UniProtKB/Swiss-Prot annotation:
InterPro entries found in the cross-reference section: FAD/NAD-bd_sf (IPR036188), GIDA_C_N (IPR049312), MnmG (IPR004416), MnmG-rel (IPR002218), MnmG-rel_CS (IPR020595), MnmG_C (IPR026904), MnmG_C_subdom (IPR047001), MnmG_C_subdom_sf (IPR044920)
Positions bound to NAD(+): 269-283
Protein name: tRNA uridine 5-carboxymethylaminomethyl modification enzyme MnmG
UniProt subunit comment: Homodimer. Heterotetramer of two MnmE and two MnmG subunits.
Location, primary (coarse class): cytoplasm
GO cellular component terms given for this protein: cytosol
Taxonomic source organism: Rickettsia peacockii (strain Rustic)
Function as written in the Swiss-Prot or TrEMBL entry: NAD-binding protein involved in the addition of a carboxymethylaminomethyl (cmnm) group at the wobble position (U34) of certain tRNAs, forming tRNA-cmnm(5)s(2)U34.
GO terms for MF: flavin adenine dinucleotide binding
């Protein structure tokens, strides 16, 4: 009988990261997915990154994950979103060639040390004494294991809706999983329904681009991965068009036929990525909505019209599309649809992504209530790391709100849960100026090195970068000009007769890297790995970062105050019954987590701290 230490079920974005992370830690790992072309499948939009999402990708890369490197092998339209705003909200994004992305992912995974791939369907999991024992395939065969990571995406009791038509499926032309849903229910997990959707696909050869707006990418693509020196994939343009009043009229007239508005769908859809029906209803005063026409590949004429996700009947979809400028004569290749599926209340898992009910069972991705490739991948890498570390009897790996967007996401999910698809935003992070895309490796790679999940190649690149940062920082502190010389150059500084270094100049409003290079041409040679830009940001926002670091220190002190797993909150005096019940239900692991639970008062936190100091001499326990 086959046996693996870790088995990952599902080969989507969460699954591939989980499997690769487990394998990198030297643990024999099996990835089970339905078919080869499922590996890294982009079920919805052909793009990676975006605002906050791009930071997640960079953090995954910092831990030696796959997503950033793979998109650099397949990216055909790179664009830094929000670049006119502050660096805390910059969002690196890349349009992907679907075929190239899947090809690159397949080549990496099929040659990955310690990783085997099995193409098949898991029907059930075997559990004994609340511990994982094995997976059972639909052909009846059994594979033994110590840990299971469920990354099932939209496959748990998945149901596609196109108008009144219902199609049981986890994705188009792929059957759903009922067995795993039933098993999770029998175990006692709280399952609910969520919904997501996708727009129709259209033929780019039938679009009149003269009626659209050109959207070029960045002149020089900025890679996602620290392993990528330069993006060698050909770059192409995207285009923008809009809906019209006629489009809106057709949608309003047919709302009763929409699966979403007819009451046919139980699941709640993503608030921040609404269907076109939702947009027309919720934003009824808007005269138009933008649609981004995104090519799906270099040699693929399929266009993804980002912005018109819908569950309307096919004939209505055809009708409304032809009211959009440039799409009057377009050919629809595949209708849009909504899909609803089961997910587990993420409060059922710990911050390691292991379930609280079953030892050795980990959940990652949409099964935890999230939406988006990047959110799924971020969970996948953490689940894979922790499953492997548990096999090796090593301490778990836990990111926090203070050091990563991944940590923010996991803390949000495990503390608050979610009743709608959770999407990452910069606004969810209290420390977003410190948690930028450009410093992801400086925040996380060393943590990954400490547990052995980072390759030797990345270690060398990271070590070299850290050395270069110190050298360039020293240079910036050496190069200087007098205030009088700066004034002659038109740079406004206080005329105090002192010398101003480049780092001093970076703090001046409207002074930028380009000006520094113009004044000191030798700095042009230091632009490798964007180090100069990084140091510019650190200098420009130094005072804000100092204050934020103080806040982070306070946060970390509370996160370090552990709460015993078996603490009886009903024995703590001066806490109301309501709060005692809430704490008993949530079982917070630290004072910091307890403070973030809705409804927990500062007085209750004080009472817990005093009680712990009285009961436990060191104020903490496991």
């Amino acid at each position: 009988m086959l046996k693996y230490d870790v088995i990952v079920i599902g080969g989507g974005h969460a699954g591939v990261e989980a499997a690769a992370a487990s394998a990198r830690l030297g643990v024999p790992t099996l990835l089970i997915t339905l078919k080869p072309e499922n590996l890294g499948e982009m079920s919805c939009n052909p793009a990676i990154g975006g605002i906050a999402k791009g930071t997640l990708v960079k953090e995954i890369d910092a831990l030696d994950g796959l997503m950033g490197y793979v998109i650099d092998q397949a990216g055909i339209h790179y664009k830094m979103l929000n670049e006119t705003r502050g660096p805390a909200v910059w969002g690196p994004r890349a349009q992907a060639d679907r075929k190239l992305y899947k090809k690159a992912m397949y080549q990496i995974l099929t040659n990955y040390p310690n990783l085997d791939i099995l193409y098949g369907k898991v029907e059930d999991i075997e559990i004994k004494s609340s511990k994982i024992e094995a997976v059972i395939l639909n052909n009846g065969s059994k594979i033994l294991c110590q840990k299971i990571i469920l990354t099932t995406g939209t496959f748990l009791s998945g149901l596609i809706h196109i108008g009144q038509k219902k199609i049981p499926a986890g994705r188009v032309d792929e059957e759903p999983s009922y067995g795993l849903s039933n098993t999770l229910k029998q175990i006692g997990f709280k399952l609910a329904r969520l919904k997501t959707g996708t727009p129709p696909r259209i033929d780019g050869r039938t679009i009149d681009y003269s009626k659209t707006i050109l959207q070029p990418g960045d002149k020089i693509p900025r890679p996602f991965s620290e392993l990528t020196n330069i993006v060698n994939v050909s770059q192409i343009n995207c285009f923008i068009t809009t809906t019209t009043s006629e489009t809106h009229d057709i949608i309003r007239e047919n709302l009763d036929k929409s699966a979403m508005y007819s009451g046919q769908i139980e699941g709640i859809g993503p608030r921040y990525c609404p269907s076109i029906e939702d947009k027309i209803v919720r934003f009824s005063t808007k005269s138009e909505h933008r649609i981004f026409l995104e090519p799906e590949g270099l040699d693929d004429y399929t266009i993804y019209p980002n912005g018109i996700s819908t569950s309307l009947p096919e004939d209505v979809q055809h009708k409304l599309i032809k009211t959009i400028p440039g799409l009057e004569n377009v050919k629809v290749l595949r209708p849009g649809y909504a899909i609803e599926y089961d997910y587990v209340d993420p409060r059922e898992i710990s911050v390691t992504l292991e379930t609280k009910k079953i030892a050795g069972l980990y959940l990652a991705g949409q099964i935890n209530g999230t939406t988006g490739y990047e959110e799924a991948a971020g969970q996948g890498i953490i689940a894979g790391i922790n499953a492997a570390l548990a096999v090796k009897d090593q301490a778990p790996f836990m990111l926090t709100r203070a050091n990563s967007y991944i940590g923010v996401m996991i803390d949000d999910l495990t503390t608050f849960g979610t009743i709608e698809p959770y999407r990452m935003f910069t606004s969810r992070s209290e420390y977003r100026l410190s948690l930028r895309a450009d410093n992801s490796d400086l925040r996380l790679t060393e943590l990954g090195m400490n547990i052995g999940v980072v390759s030797e190649k990345r270690k060398k690149i990271f070590t070299k970068k850290c050395e270069d940062i110190e050298k360039i920082k020293s240079l910036l502190n050496t190069l200087s000009l007098t205030t009088s010389k700066l004034a002659k150059m038109g740079i406004q500084v206080a005329q105090d007769g002192t010398y101003k270094t480049v780092l001093d100049l970076f703090k001046i409003p409207n002074f930028n890297v380009e000006q520094a290079i113009k004044i000191f041409p030798m700095l042009k040679e230091t632009q490798n790995n964007n180090i100069l830009q990084l140091l510019y940001i650190e200098a420009k926002y130094a005072s804000y970062l100092t204050r934020q670091h103080a806040d982070i220190n306070l946060f970390q002190s509370e996160e370090a105050q552990f709460i015993p797993k078996n603490l009886d909150y009903f024995k703590i005096p001066s806490i109301s019954l309501e709060i005692q019940e809430k704490l008993s239900s949530h079982k917070p692991t630290t004072i910091g987590v307890a403070r973030r639970i809705p409804g927990i008062t500062p007085a209750a936190i004080t009472a817990i701290i005093i009680y712990l100091k009285t009961k436990y001499s060191d104020g903490s326990s496991t």
